[in-house]
Amino acid sequence: MLKPMYYEFFFIFPKERELFESFLLDTTHLALEESSLENLKAFDDKETIEFISQSSWHYFATHDPLKEHLKEKPQHLKNFVILRSQKDLNNSLILALEAFCLNLKQNLQSEFDFFYLSRNLASKDWLEAYKQAILPVQCAKFYIHPSWHQKPSHISTDDCIMIDPALAFGSGHHESTSMCLELLSDLDLKRKNALDVGCGSGILSIALKKQGVSALVACDTDSLAVEETLKNFSLNQIPLLAQDKVIYGSTQKIEGRFDIIVANLVADVVKSLYSEFVRLCNHTLILSGILETHLNSVLQIYYNGFEILEQRQRNEWVALKLLKKQPIN
């Protein structure tokens, strides 16, 4: 009997990677995995390392590519995005990305390239290999682990978050998520009310509940994210109380004010939500998912309403802990 197949896509986006990642999520509704050759080596995935390193990468550019700049293999293999699907998206997805590049060129008046590889493998083999590759990670006080890894006996259940990365939008391995968890670990949130904007897998909402918040609202504009959040609350045996809500939609549906707001988004969305965060935030705002190249434009917008308490950076990703400025009477 033939094993079912799945399709694996590797992408490198030299410019505006977060815009392309958002486009992939919106277009395919599939979770993305960001990785690097270093991470794959840690997973001992020799077959994938060999495939990525030795294959001739295809590319698309919105300008006539210069041979000295666009080689068969891109030189910047530090980061790439992996997408896996049970359907062959090769033709439709590449055409959609090409159209997106052209649209970005027109709107942003800049040139855009992307590199890609694809392959297909047996589903059963991949699922087992993937489970072996995903390891638990410690993010400050929080121990993040998939359901097929048992927590160590010396770690308290209160500090453990169970997330299955194959199904999730955020698993603690990405810099932006881990920095959010680190910033949350330092806060006393007992009897506080909290808002998680762009909840994704629900990992930050679960962390907020474990930190003792008395009321939680989580929202996301992706219905799949709402389903994942609810699923992961159940996986972690955290009941949603009467005052807790998981909402499909953005902040416009939310009333009241919150002691703490967390938003692990992309820079453009963070900038667009400034007035909403001014309306909703009563004290602390944690922002993440901001690439270093967009940091100054974010700070320029948030300067009038918030004070910077802490800034963290890991690789090219930045997270901010902000304090709401109170009006002077």
Swiss-Prot record:
SUPFAM superfamilies: S-adenosyl-L-methionine-dependent methyltransferases
Chief localization: cytoplasm
MF (Gene Ontology): protein-lysine N-methyltransferase activity
Top-level taxon: Bacteria
InterPro entries from the UniProt entry: Ribosomal_L11_MeTrfase_PrmA, Ribosomal_PrmA_MeTrfase, SAM-dependent_MTases_sf
Keyword Transferase: yes
Residues that, per the record, bind S-adenosyl-L-methionine: T177, G198, D220, N264
Signal sequence, start to end: none
Role summary: Methylates ribosomal protein L11.
Family classification: Belongs to the methyltransferase superfamily. PrmA family.
Name of the featured protein: Ribosomal protein L11 methyltransferase
Source organism (scientific name): Helicobacter pylori (strain HPAG1)
